[in-house]
């Protein structure tokens, strides 16, 4: 799965994001797989390479990622979006306005998300 996180980081770098992988936050300890920063916005990405995640599993993943984003913006002075990147196309594309993006569509998501910011969950610092 580290290769999956690396690939996610490479795609972000190709789109001119500053990338940090495996960012550790403390109190409480949390790890963010990939952070992509561009201008005053950060994408906090949780990489999931599991197959066929059900809605309850995705709900829990999204809830935890939102908590990580809240912690991140309490430290960093910028807005951030939680994003879940998956290895496979999931039937669910959004939970609580958090995008569930298959890796094969990450590049086009990065091209388009700025225009869709008002429909995505953003947490301000």
Where are the predicted features?
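Acidic-basic catalytic patches of nuclease active cores, encompassing PD-(D/E)XK
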Residues: 1-23
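Surface-exposed interaction regions that form or flank ligand-binding interfaces
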Residues: 94-125
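Short acidic loop-to-beta-strand element that houses the catalytic metal-binding Asp/Glu
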Residues: 31-37
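Acidic-residue sensor for enzyme active/binding pockets
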Residues: 5, 31, 46
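Short glycine/proline-enriched coil/turn segments at helix->beta-strand junctions
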Residues: 17, 39-41
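Extended, folded domain segments that form the structural surfaces/walls around functional sites
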Residues: 9, 37, 55
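A short beta-turn/loop motif at secondary-structure boundaries
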Residues: 25-28
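Catalytic cores of nucleic-acid endonucleases
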Residues: 42, 47-104
């Amino acid at each position: 799965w580290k290769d999956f996180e690396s690939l996610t980081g490479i795609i972000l770098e190709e789109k001119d994001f500053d990338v940090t992988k495996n960012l550790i936050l403390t109190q409480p300890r949390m790890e963010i797989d990939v952070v992509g920063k561009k201008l005053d916005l950060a994408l906090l990405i949780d990489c999931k390479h599991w197959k066929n995640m059900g809605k309850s599993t995705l709900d829990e993943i999204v809830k935890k990622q939102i908590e990580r984003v809240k912690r991140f913006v309490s430290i960093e002075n910028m807005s951030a979006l939680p994003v879940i990147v998956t290895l496979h196309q999931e039937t669910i594309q959004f939970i609580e306005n958090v995008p569930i993006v298959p890796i094969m569509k990450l590049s086009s998501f990065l091209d388009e998300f700025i225009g869709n910011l008002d429909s995505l969950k953003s947490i301000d610092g």
